[in-house]
From Swiss-Prot:
Heterodimer of an alpha and a beta chain. The gene is luxB. One of its GO terms (molecular function) is alkanal monooxygenase (FMN-linked) activity. This is Alkanal monooxygenase beta chain. The keyword Chaperone does not apply. Keywords: Flavoprotein, FMN, Luminescence, Monooxygenase, Oxidoreductase, Photoprotein.
Length: 324
């Protein structure tokens, strides 16, 4: 089992954008000296539920601050960006970091974003797939020559070519059954979302297995990742209230048709929130449900920076003791 971090960079009544960005930098430099494998940065637009609209830009900055840890995007939304620009930036970061960059990507989860970026909502899945093909060609061969309904141009060289053979490691966020099935056919590992229920994660994992097996994909080589929120406190009530405040605005935005309190309770129960026993039990169950080989942790629900670092140290000690 491998462990990394992810940053959501939410802002709310207790956290302003400057504080969120500075904390991300400080925690990144701190964990670079520890036993974590990677850090991935969340992309969001047009709300306080994530102040990073350009995770590749942030990745470049954080790679420059660090020496050994891998860094990349958690969910770079390829449907709303030009695929050649994504490939150029990914290859450049791969070169500059000598292979430490990771490209986590995603389809667009918000219809309003598709419209604002002038993308055809009615052809979203097809556009997503075509964008990935262009990016994948560029990362693996250094060239692309698309001829589809969305992009058509002569063969070009995407410079610089990737440092890593085959391009930087790629993961796709499990945002829908369509995406999961598409990823399974290609053998692209998933990133399971922190706000999906264990039942949804299990359903996605089982569907991935079935489709991958049908297409002859070697599942032993697939290293799915699982996002988990962390708020450890022996005062379990405080941890849960703190986490509730941290995610409330996000849940309101992303789940407008669900009962707010029920969804908040589900997320808190199925992430590592509460006292030590509750955190371990919730994380263990979530991992079992989806079969992830790597866990990405966000310590952001804890308001106090020193408390964040103390909990990071506890996790780091356990990594060293049990997973190295």
């Amino acid at each position: 089992m491998k462990f990394g971090l992810f940053f959501l960079n939410f802002i709310n009544s207790t956290t302003v954008q400057e504080q969120s960005i500075v904390r991300m930098q400080e925690i990144t430099e701190y964990v670079d000296k520890l036993n974590f494998e990677q850090i991935l940065v969340y992309e969001n637009h047009f709300s306080g539920n994530g102040v990073v609209g350009a995770p590749l830009t942030v990745s470049g900055f954080l790679l420059g601050l660090t020496e050994k840890i891998k860094i990349g995007s958690l969910n770079h939304i390829i449907t709303t960006h030009h695929p050649v620009r994504i490939a150029e930036e990914a290859c450049l970061l791969d070169q500059l970091s000598e292979g430490r960059f990771i490209l986590g990507f995603s389809d667009c989860e918000k219809k309003d974003e598709m419209r604002l970026f002038n993308r055809p909502v009615e052809y979203q899945q097809q556009l997503f797939e075509e964008c990935y093909e262009i990016i994948n060609d560029a990362l693996t061969t250094g060239y692309c020559n698309p001829d589809n309904d969305f992009y058509s141009f002569p063969k070009i060289s995407v410079n610089p070519h990737a440092y890593t053979q085959g391009g930087p490691r790629r993961y796709v966020t499990a945002t829908s059954h369509h995406i999961v099935e598409w990823a399974a056919k290609k053998g692209i590992p998933l990133i399971f979302k922190w706000d999906d229920s264990n039942d949804v994660r299990y359903e996605y994992a089982e569907r991935y297995k079935a489709v991958a097996d049908k297409y002859g994909i070697d599942l032993s080589a697939i290293d799915h990742q699982l996002m988990v929120l962390v708020n450890y406190n022996e005062d379990s009530h405080k941890a849960k209230q703190e986490t509730r405040a941290f995610i409330r605005d996000y849940v309101l935005e992303m789940y407008p048709n669900e009962n707010l309190e029920n969804k908040l309770e589900e997320i808190i129960t199925e992430n590592a929130v509460g006292d030590y026993t509750e955190c371990i039990a919730a994380a263990k169950l979530a991992i079992e449900k989806c079969g992830a080989k790597s866990v990405l942790l966000s310590f952001e629900p804890m308001n106090d920076l020193m408390h964040q670092k103390n909990v990071i140290n506890i996790v780091n000690d356990n990594i060293k003791k049990y997973h190295m």
